[in-house]
């Protein structure tokens, strides 16, 4: 063996020895086992602690961002239902868990499920996540403290009211026992009137402001925002069609060019109207914070036009049933560059089928073949439901609701669609 060959041999042997020591290090495998246990427990806590719609949101958000790794064959990955595997520094995760505790570790795992790449998880990112968790806990504690104070305040008000009632009753008894009631009556009546006015003033702060009519719907939940941040949308006739009566819808579909809707029974049309007649969603879609609710599901070309799909997680309550799923919005741009909504539907979706709902290939295959882009469209800001339909929109911190009510008895809710805010990505 020449000196050169001997040198190469020794280098290979040294490298093999180091790699073998790395692979067979008991300390390393114990560390990996500990990290795996921590991550598995965090996943379990995350999934068990979420409502169905929250878990759908987590899976959908992560699925939008993840891609299959080249090392896996596509078929194998699909069979295993893996979206992605993540390579992350196990020492970093273990140190983070020991330094900050389980809540920060759980948030790190949640961010991985939401699509955070392992290469982006470093010490600086861990510290940032820890700061977010601390701030979240602080706000939670403040909210708890505020709730306790409000509860104590309500109890004190009730106690004060009870004491006033007792005092009033005692005065009334004393009054009945006195002589010369006629002389003292006016002053006592004035005193009772003053007490009554004070009680009414105290209760005045508890009266809620009445909802205001906005764009054909009653809107609750905060001041009306300026139009500066609102987005432009138009509504295609095939979407507006679902706001009509079932009989009229059937008549128009039977005369139309879309084969998928021709010949449907009136019962089928009524069932489909429940999930398609959700045009009130455009109030949210046009708002400046629509991106907090809707995820971009990608673009593709079909039927001669470029289309874009957006989805949001939601729940539909109707007929005593509650269904979780996604709100689908399909758009194309008209000649002026304004997005036209040609597809709008609530699709009931289970945890197991969320992958198909957000898969661009599946979405494209199931989409309508050709949309008549020349048909007259309506500006979304001018849309008003047909006369006799009573609905209102309610915007809250983490959700947006559309509530349909019985026009004859507005206390009766016929249908409710709730659109949920997307999970927080750090």
From Swiss-Prot:
UniProt feature, compositional bias: Basic residues: 220-230
Pfam short name (any one): DUF3654
Spans annotated as Disordered: 136-230
Signal sequence region: none
Composition bias type Basic and acidic residues, residue spans: 136-172
Coiled-coil blocks: none
InterPro entries: DUF3654, UPF0329
Family listed: Belongs to the UPF0329 family.
Protein name stated in the entry: UPF0329 protein ECU06_0040
